[in-house]
Structures are given as structure tokens and as C-alpha cells.
């Protein structure tokens, strides 16, 4: 009989691994330190692309990455903000804002997953008690807090930037744990079966709020992490008093890290000189470009002219993008001229979900353009990628400077775990595997550009949203590598995992529960 009967997956938003384990070393996170010293820990857990809340949390909770969600086992969420081309005119998807139909779009995310994947709550089995506390990626949850949109509004009001912000955020942290404990203490109140939940999701978003306002180096950000450590300690202590700790595994991780930019840029010159017009479903339905989001990574959507329906947005061909719009501009050249842009990625024409190519470009320090191609083949567990730089001496991600990574630049196809082992310690870890998965999703942008974090733009669907310098999204390790702790019950072995990926967490928890993962899961159990 399986000893472990309950699993709690806790995501602390916006925590980079190096800082997390440094705070543990300094003695500032004593409860996390205890989990580290008695359970499984990993200092090199690689997140998804791009390193923003969505899709990374979706990938954690489903154990898979994105792709062509219509035809292959994967999830369907490419980014936090994207353009839904299934409609004519297309609709904005922005999980942090109101949508075109004036509904809170975060509630749409469970539908956007598609039905070729499952959340961990679904994987534990029908009829089981499951809980989700402030985590909106919760398909399969028996109980979800906040229970109504009105309570969600009140919760968001609690998290506003006010003079009492710190107090309210600490209150929010405490509430997450208290709600979780109440599901164990008074299960009859929340579930049809009077049993504690077998699987639960927790999301602490307060750390992300403070990082964007003050940066991860600020005392208020670190103080908040210390408070989360405190309430996790309360969770462990109370579960022990209730008699549940010996049969409960607790996983602690983050969705992404963060970085500090030096400057906020302006895209006005790019737009004006290119003759492009921002699309808006109401104000400018005939616009031909949508910048879904651009902080350090920019996601650019363009409307093809090869369609008789003037409101429909098919993906344009690359030849059309080389001579685009009324001015006939080469969009690829123009995007590489944006201040601070160093990298660019796009699909080749004729790609399918089974095979295709992704074209990569890097502008080096001499403004010379370096090129490479990622070939992909297969889907699901058969998916593999091959990385071929045009010049073997100068590759896009600088992998050839490191022996393990350079060994995979051999003109052969390699698996996700081969790329993980070779690149987890580098900038742009796993990118050769993750970029084609992203572009296979028809919801993904036509062209993606990236700075190296020195300059950011803060554009969401064509509008500038803020001027903050504290960000996350790019492929540098500080944004792409997160911590992982798995502990609680003494049944968890004590061991350090040298490297892993965020999609390994769910299959590990399922293995401890004696459950099998869904066919879409690309992660592997760490035990």
C-alpha cells in the first residue's frame, strides 16, 4: 500500500535559483532549508520558453510544453499575451486583463490548454478530492479559491500598490496557507467526500508583484520570501499536528527568475518608418501588425494579404514578410534594427507539427548577423531537434564554447533530456528543444525578437504598459533557472538532483502517489 496519499505543488512566482539558495545559505529561509536538508533539491531546474508566468506555470502543472495542441499531446498556451487568429477579426488574449468580451481572461486559460493534455489534478483520477488555492490553471479541481469572480476582484484589490501594500501581501500569503490547511481540517466543507485532497495547487503571486515594483535585490522582496518561508513552516507544522505530514509530499518551485534592465526603449521609430499600423479589434480592425508583448522578448504578429476576408489573419509567408505592407519593407531587417535587439527567431515556410525548421539570427557586437537553423522531427515522446549553425565557429547561443553543449552540434537529432544535460548550466538552456515546440503552436507569433536584458519595451498588444526595469522573459540563466525542493513526508529520499526541467515535477509527484502520468507528459520522474 502506498504511504504517500497527498501531494501539494506550491509555485512561488518570480524567484531565481541562485538568490533562493543564497538566502537559504544565509539562514534566512529556515523552513526551506529543512526541506532541502531532508528531501530532494535541485539548483538547476530549467523553465519553459518564454520565461514568463504563462506558459511556464502551465508547463509545470501539466508536465508538458506547448505545441500544436490540436494535433499532438501538449498544451495550447504559448504566452501571457497572444493573438487568437481563430476569429475574424482576431481577438486579444491577455490573461492579466479584461478581454474583448469584457470577461476576466484568466478564467479562459483552462479552455486554452486544449484537450490533448491534462493538469496534475486531472491525472490523479476522476472522483478524487483536489484543491487549487489562487491557482487558475486548475482544470479538474474539486475546490478552487477564490470561489467567485467577486472574491477574485476583492483578492486583486488586496494586491494593489497602496501605502499598506506590504501588510496586504503578507495577509495574502497567510490566506493561501490557511485555505490549504482548512481543506485538510474541514474537508467535508469543501468536498463531497470527507477526505483531505489527494492533490493541491498553491500559487504565491506576491513575490512577482514586489519584484516588478522594487526588484529582487530589494529588502521588501527578500522580506516577503522570508514570510512565505514562515507560512510554509506553519503549513508543515499544522499538517504534522493533524497527522497528515507523514503521508504528504510538498513540492516548492518557481515559474521563472528575473533580471534588471538598464533602460526602457521606444518603438515609435520602428512603427513609423516601417509603415505598419497597430491592429485593434475596435479602434483599428484593419491594422496589419500586433505586438502581443515585448519586454525583453518581442512577439510580433503580421496579417497576410493573401486572403479575401479583410478581417482574417492568416500567418504570412516569409517571402511576403521580406516585402511587406504598402512600403514593401523587409520586416526581418527592420526588427533587427530595433535598439537592443540581438536575437530573432521565426518559422520556415511549410512547417508541420511533425517536422520543420526554425530560423535563428544573432546580431553580434560588430553588428554582423550570425545565422543558424533548428530542425525538428516527430511529436510527443518521439520529438527530437537538430541544431545547425551556418558558421560552426560562431553559433547563436554560444554553445560551442562549452564541451558538453558543443558535442551536440554534430548534425544529428537529439532528445530534450540530451539538450538539458548539455545546456542546463548555460544561458539559453534547452532553447534548441523549446523554440520549435513554441512555434508549432498556431497561436504563437510570426516573428520573435529578443534583447539581452539591457533594454526592455513593456508593450502589450501595441500599448506601452509601464516603465519598470525589473523584468523576466529572456533566456539568460537568471531568468530561466528556478529552484526546486521536494519534501514533507520522510518517505521522500534525501538527494541533490544536479539538473532537471520544470516538466519533471508532476511525474515525480505522481510516482510518489502511485499514479501514472498522462501520455502528453514529457517530464520524467526524479526518483
Predicted feature locations:
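Beta-strand elements within well-structured catalytic alpha/beta cores of enzymes
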Residues: 4-20, 35, 60, 124, ...
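Short secondary-structure boundary/capping segments
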Residues: 23-27, 145-150, 215-221, 264-271, ...
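Short, solvent-exposed turn/loop segments enriched in Gly/Ser/Thr/Pro and often Arg
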Residues: 41-61, 133-143, 203, 522-526
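Substrate-binding rim/cap in mid-to-C-terminal beta-strand-loop elements of soluble/periplasmic
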Residues: 275-315, 469-512
Amino acid at each position: 500500500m502506498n504511504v504517500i496519499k497527498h501531494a501539494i505543488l506550491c509555485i512561488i512566482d518570480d524567484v531565481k535559483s541562485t538568490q533562493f539558495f543564497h538566502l537559504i545559505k544565509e539562514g534566512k529561509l529556515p523552513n526551506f532549508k529543512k526541506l532541502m536538508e531532508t528531501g530532494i533539491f535541485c539548483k538547476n531546474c530549467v523553465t519553459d520558453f518564454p520565461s514568463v508566468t504563462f506558459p511556464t506555470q502551465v508547463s509545470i502543472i501539466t508536465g508538458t510544453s506547448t505545441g500544436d495542441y490540436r494535433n499532438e499531446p501538449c498544451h495550447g498556451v504559448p504566452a501571457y499575451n497572444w493573438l487568437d487568429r481563430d476569429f475574424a477579426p482576431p481577438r486579444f488574449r491577455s490573461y492579466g486583463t479584461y478581454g474583448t468580451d469584457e470577461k476576466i481572461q484568466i478564467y479562459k486559460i483552462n479552455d486554452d490548454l486544449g484537450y490533448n493534455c491534462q493538469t496534475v489534478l486531472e491525472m490523479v483520477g476522476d472522483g478524487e478530492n483536489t484543491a487549487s488555492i489562487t491557482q487558475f490553471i486548475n482544470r479538474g479541481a474539486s475546490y478552487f479559491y477564490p470561489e467567485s469572480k467577486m472574491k477574485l476582484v476583492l483578492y486583486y484589490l488586496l494586491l494593489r500598490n497602496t501605502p499598506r501594500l506590504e501588510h496586504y501581501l503578507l495577509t495574502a500569503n497567510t490566506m493561501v496557507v490557511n485555505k490549504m490547511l482548512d481543506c485538510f481540517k474541514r474537508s467535508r466543507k469543501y468536498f463531497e467526500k470527507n477526505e483531505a485532497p489527494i492533490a493541491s495547487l498553491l500559487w504565491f503571486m506576491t513575490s512577482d508583484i514586489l519584484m516588478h515594483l522594487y526588484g529582487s535585490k530589494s529588502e521588501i522582496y527578500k522580506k516577503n520570501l522570508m514570510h512565505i518561508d514562515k507560512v510554509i513552516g506553519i503549513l508543515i507544522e499544522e499538517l504534522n499536528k493533524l497527522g497528515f505530514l507523514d503521508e504528504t509530499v510538498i513540492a516548492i518551485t518557481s515559474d521563472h527568475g528575473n533580471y534588471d534592465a538598464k533602460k526602457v526603449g521606444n518603438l515609435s521609430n520602428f512603427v513609423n518608418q516601417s509603415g505598419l499600423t497597430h491592429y485593434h479589434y475596435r479602434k483599428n480592425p484593419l491594422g496589419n501588425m500586433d505586438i502581443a508583448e515585448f519586454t525583453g522578448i518581442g512577439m510580433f504578429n503580421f496579417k497576410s494579404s493573401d486572403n479575401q476576408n479583410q478581417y482574417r489573419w492568416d500567418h504570412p509567408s516569409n517571402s511576403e514578410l521580406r516585402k511587406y505592407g504598402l512600403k514593401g519593407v523587409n520586416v526581418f531587417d527592420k526588427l533587427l534594427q530595433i535598439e537592443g535587439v540581438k536575437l530573432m527567431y521565426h518559422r520556415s515556410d511549410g512547417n508541420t507539427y511533425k517536422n520543420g525548421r526554425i530560423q535563428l539570427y544573432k546580431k553580434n557586437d560588430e553588428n554582423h548577423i550570425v545565422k543558424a537553423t533548428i530542425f525538428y522531427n516527430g511529436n510527443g515522446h518521439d520529438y527530437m531537434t537538430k541544431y545547425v549553425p551556418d558558421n560552426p565557429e560562431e553559433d547563436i547561443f554560444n554553445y560551442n564554447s562549452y564541451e558538453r553543449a558543443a558535442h551536440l552540434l554534430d548534425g544529428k537529432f537529439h532528445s530534450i533530456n540530451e539538450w538539458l544535460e548539455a545546456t542546463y548550466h548555460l544561458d539559453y538552456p534547452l532553447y534548441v528543444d523549446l523554440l520549435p515546440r513554441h512555434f508549432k503552436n498556431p497561436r504563437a507569433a510570426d516573428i520573435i525578437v529578443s534583447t539581452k536584458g539591457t533594454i526592455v519595451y513593456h508593450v502589450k498588444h501595441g500599448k506601452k504598459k509601464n516603465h519598470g526595469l525589473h523584468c523576466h522573459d529572456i533566456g539568460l540563466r537568471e531568468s530561466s533557472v528556478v529552484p526546486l525542493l521536494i519534501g514533507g513526508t520522510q518517505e521522500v529520499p534525501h538527494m541533490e538532483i544536479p539538473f532537471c526541467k520544470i516538466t519533471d515535477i508532476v511525474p515525480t509527484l505522481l510516482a510518489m502517489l502511485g499514479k501514472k502520468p498522462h501520455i502528453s507528459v514529457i517530464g520524467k520522474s526524479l526518483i
